[in-house]
Amino acid sequence: NRNEGYGGLNQTFFSVGFKVFDFLNFGVSANYNFGKITNESSRQEQNIDFGTFFIKTSSLVGFNYRFATQLKIQLTSEVRLDAMAYYVPKNSLNATNESVYFTRSVTTQNLGDLENVDLAASNLKKTSISLGDQYSFGLGITKAKKWFVGGQYSQRNSADYVNNFISLDNITYANGSRLSFGGFYLPDYSSITSYWKRIVYRAGVRFEDTGVLFNNQALKETGISFGVSFPMAGYSNANIGVEFGKRGSQDNDLIQESYWNLIVGLSLNDIWFVKRKFN
């Protein structure tokens, strides 16, 4: 027997922020989420060429909102204390589902019998996936254009997660959380003699309870990351980072995996609406 899944969610959003006081900001984001997830289960027997496959696919759409606030307290003329918090209310995703059974040759990969499942008959053609609320708060100290160090705690109430279409017998859910610490260092942002002094160096570490229970055992992750931001023309940057992590545990006959991620991105910035000095 084999189970595998792939896919995920994409997000587009619109955000607006307000300055309540010089030291206090408030913002709200409206998010449109969309994507597709697929679960494939298969069964193959020894000395039998054809295996049985069962594929479930859900196309997902939904909206949610995020409310956030930021507090800035000037400790000295150069050093500032930053605090933040956000909250995402409980929401749901609308799912349009498809399911198919088929047999396939192990040696030639040729398809055998194929049958589309009538999901409408079992009221599973269109379903709703419930997502719990989530919140986060963080605290950090920074010296403008020089360094930053801080931490953040986040919790997702994933015990409320419900998916009536795609589920596994040995997978359940509990509330998940993440605790992370990190910072950056910029040697000299205004240096004109050394390009390397204008590079931002970053590092971080995280400890995460994913909220997924496998055979009633919590699936946890830890990770450490390093990155650099290379200044480009104008106000833009090229960002490169790498993360090394571990997921799972070897306790109770479970599996622990080690992985690494390479992150590459661009931060494209410019100044708009500059008032003319000369006509």
Language-model regions, residue ranges each:
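Outer-membrane beta-barrel porins/channels
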Residues: 1-279
